[in-house]
């Protein structure tokens, strides 16, 4: 376990080396340092995970105090690494999937300006995420939380010479900062009430000090939920995720599969004891997830950009995880987080291969017939798409998503179950719409398959992990998270499995019917009045950007314009202006004429006499 600090030190050192190189290194050397540091981190993580399983720590968790960061009076905080079943799972996902993404990126980014800068940012991204999942208290978790936010800004705006990319990065940074402010308020409340931010101490003290439904716990968990929805792109702070596709495609894979958007799910799962004492907020978590997954599913139906379709699918799948957390299916949420990392990384990397092969074309309707020219990318999309659609029995996504649906049913949340089933149907349609349009039909562009081990190896490994093989990896969460209500299952569970499987297959068949062939019905529907209305509404993600522009952006710009004129200074300037005006008026009386002075003297005396008589 002494190797545990190396998991984040290796990518941190890689970041420093690449930063100080200032782009002077060759691409091969930059790739060696950038990919190698994450590879060493993955090896260190593998050893830590092996040691955790072979020699289970007493109490189910291992703590390693590195140093005391701060001490003031009764307050002290240590930088301590905490490894239990939950952090072991996250450690494997972040380093394992992160390494595969880095390996693919070494091929994808060849010839790009800022090659070493890219790997410097991604190394820092991995280090920040590991800092987040290994910290034993919410303060250090928050440092990692802000670190991944900074890295997302740097990577989304990687092509900063393009104004739109810079705007997308700024949008992601600002929207997620809103959630971060809420999270900071949550930390303030928890520290004020408990005098500590150590997560394990909070989980012990909370039920001792407060009853279920306590106002302070409700406010604290609501604030933590605000932070979670910002990082994990859930309603109402979901608007940044689709625009984040402005960054390089491996960045999208890193954000969606291995790092940033899973942070909110991890936060709620890690603080499960606090949320169970605030049942109203826990129920709100499930509702937020259910609404998000349905709205994102409809938005994905009409997108034409290959990466934006996958972005909305991520929003929807994170919604399933929030739904699971909301019904108390803690294990199922983390299980789906893991399997989702496999097939979403596969889909994004495969989309990167398609984009490069098609000369950076991202509109799926300008592709077509790619299955012959790009067999590996096609296989990746078929397997990854099947896992995303939860094709029964063959894919990892089926087992994790089905567990969520069963827990929603077993806990009595039928409305959330219905939302999950609707989302499953939509997922099947938009996923295979992408596959049928891009890979079948008449070719519309020249495409050339990529070569090299850094291209095909990550895709091949992720293809295997996206099948039922990935579902065989069981997160060691026993004793870490509360046991779910519907843990056992039975005949009802098998019936639900068949129903959800049938829904997934029905969605695939409907997509084939609509998008294989001439697509006359789809064209006619798109040209109809309802089709134009809903198509435009869904294409713009239900108009949230428009709404926020009217509610927040325009008033803010108006306020900036008003303050730019410095109204306070102008208001305060009235005083000296009045004094100067009075002085100018009085100076007119000094005209050097004796008659005027005598008249003024008599007039002043008359005024004083009148005032005395009235008094």
UniProtKB/Swiss-Prot annotation:
GO terms for cellular component: plasma membrane; respiratory chain complex I. It is found in: Cell inner membrane. One of its GO terms (biological process) is ATP synthesis coupled electron transport. The keyword Membrane applies. Signal peptide: none annotated. Its main location: membrane. InterPro entries: NADHpl_OxRdtase_5_subgr, ND/Mrp_TM, NU5C-like, Proton_antipo_N. It catalyses: a quinone + NADH + 5 H(+)(in) = a quinol + NAD(+) + 4 H(+)(out). It holds the Pfam family Proton_antipo_N. Its EC number is 7.1.1.-. Keywords: Cell inner membrane, Cell membrane, Membrane, NAD, Quinone, Translocase, Transmembrane, Transmembrane helix, Ubiquinone. One of its GO terms (molecular function) is NADH dehydrogenase (ubiquinone) activity. Composed of 13 different subunits. Subunits NuoA, H, J, K, L, M, N constitute the membrane sector of the complex. NDH-1 shuttles electrons from NADH, via FMN and iron-sulfur (Fe-S) centers, to quinones in the respiratory chain. The immediate electron acceptor for the enzyme in this species is believed to be ubiquinone. Couples the redox reaction to proton translocation (for every two electrons transferred, four hydrogen ions are translocated across the cytoplasmic membrane), and thus conserves the redox energy in a proton gradient. Belongs to the complex I subunit 5 family. This is NADH-quinone oxidoreductase subunit L. It comes from Pseudomonas aeruginosa (strain ATCC 15692 / DSM 22644 / CIP 104116 / JCM 14847 / LMG 12228 / 1C / PRS 101 / PAO1). The lineage of its organism: Bacteria, Pseudomonadati, Pseudomonadota, Gammaproteobacteria, Pseudomonadales.
């Amino acid at each position: 376990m002494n190797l545990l600090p190396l998991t984040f030190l290796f990518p941190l050192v890689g970041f420093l080396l690449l930063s100080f190189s200032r782009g002077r290194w060759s691409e091969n050397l930059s790739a060696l340092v950038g990919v190698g540091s994450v590879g060493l981190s993955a090896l260190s993580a593998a050893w830590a995970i092996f040691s955790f399983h072979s020699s289970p720590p007493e109490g189910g968790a291992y703590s390693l105090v590195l140093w005391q960061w701060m001490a003031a009076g009764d307050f002290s905080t240590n930088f301590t690494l905490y490894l239990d079943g939950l952090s072991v799972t996250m450690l494997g996902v972040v380093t394992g999937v992160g390494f595969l993404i880095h390996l693919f990126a070494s091929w994808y980014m060849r010839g790009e300006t800022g090659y070493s800068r890219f790997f410097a940012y991604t190394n820092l991204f991995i280090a920040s995420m590991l800092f987040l999942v290994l910290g034993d208290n919410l303060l250090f978790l928050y440092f990692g939380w802000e670190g991944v936010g900074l890295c997302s800004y740097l990577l989304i705006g990687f092509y900063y010479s393009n104004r739109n990319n810079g705007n997308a990065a700024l949008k992601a940074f600002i929207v997620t900062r809103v959630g971060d402010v809420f999270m900071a308020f949550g930390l303030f409340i928890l520290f004020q009430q408990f005098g500590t931010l150590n997560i394990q101490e909070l989980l012990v003290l909370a039920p001792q000090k407060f009853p279920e439904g306590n106002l302070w716990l409700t406010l604290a968990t609501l604030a933590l939920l605000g932070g979670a929805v910002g990082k994990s792109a859930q309603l109402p702070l979901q608007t940044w995720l689709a625009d984040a596709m402005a960054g390089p495609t491996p960045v999208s894979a890193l954000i969606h599969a291995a790092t940033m958007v899973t942070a909110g799910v991890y936060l709620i799962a890690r603080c499960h004891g606090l949320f169970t004492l605030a049942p109203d907020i826990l129920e709100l978590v499930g509702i937020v997830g259910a609404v998000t997954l349905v709205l994102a599913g409809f938005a994905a139906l009409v997108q034409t950009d290959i990466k934006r379709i996958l972005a909305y699918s991520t929003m929807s799948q994170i919604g399933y995880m929030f739904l699971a957390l909301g019904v108390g299916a803690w294990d199922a949420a983390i299980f789906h987080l893991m399997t989702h990392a496999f097939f979403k990384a596969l889909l994004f990397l495969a989309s990167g291969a398609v984009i490069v092969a098609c000369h950076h074309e991202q509109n799926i309707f300008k592709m077509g017939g790619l299955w012959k020219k790009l067999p590996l990318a096609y296989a990746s999309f078929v397997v990854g798409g099947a896992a995303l659609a939860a094709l029964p029995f063959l894919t990892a996504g089926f087992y994790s998503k089905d567990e969520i649906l069963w827990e929603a049913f077993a806990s009595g949340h039928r409305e959330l179950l219905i939302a999950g089933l609707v989302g499953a149907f939509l997922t099947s349609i938009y996923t295979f719409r992408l596959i049928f349009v891009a890979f079948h039909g008449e070719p519309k562009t020249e495409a050339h398959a990529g070569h090299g081990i850094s291209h095909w190896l990550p895709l091949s490994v992720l293809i295997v992990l996206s099948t039922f093989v990935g579902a065989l990896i069981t997160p060691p969460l026993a004793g870490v998270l509360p046991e779910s209500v519907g843990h056992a299952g039975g005949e009802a569970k098998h019936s639900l499995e068949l129903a959800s499987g049938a829904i997934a297959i029905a969605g695939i068949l409907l997509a084939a019917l609509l998008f294989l062939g001439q697509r006359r019905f789809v064209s006619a529907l798109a040209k109809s009045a309802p089709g134009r209305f809903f198509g435009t509404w869904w294409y713009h993600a239900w108009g949230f950007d428009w709404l926020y522009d009217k509610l927040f952006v325009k008033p803010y710009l108006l306020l900036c314009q008003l303050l730019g004129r410095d109204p306070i200074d102008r208001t305060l300037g009235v005083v000296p202006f009045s004094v100067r005006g009075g002085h100018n008026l009085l100076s007119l009386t000094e005209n050097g004429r004796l008659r005027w002075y005598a008249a003024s003297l008599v007039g002043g005396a008359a005024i004083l006499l009148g005032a005395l008589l009235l008094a």
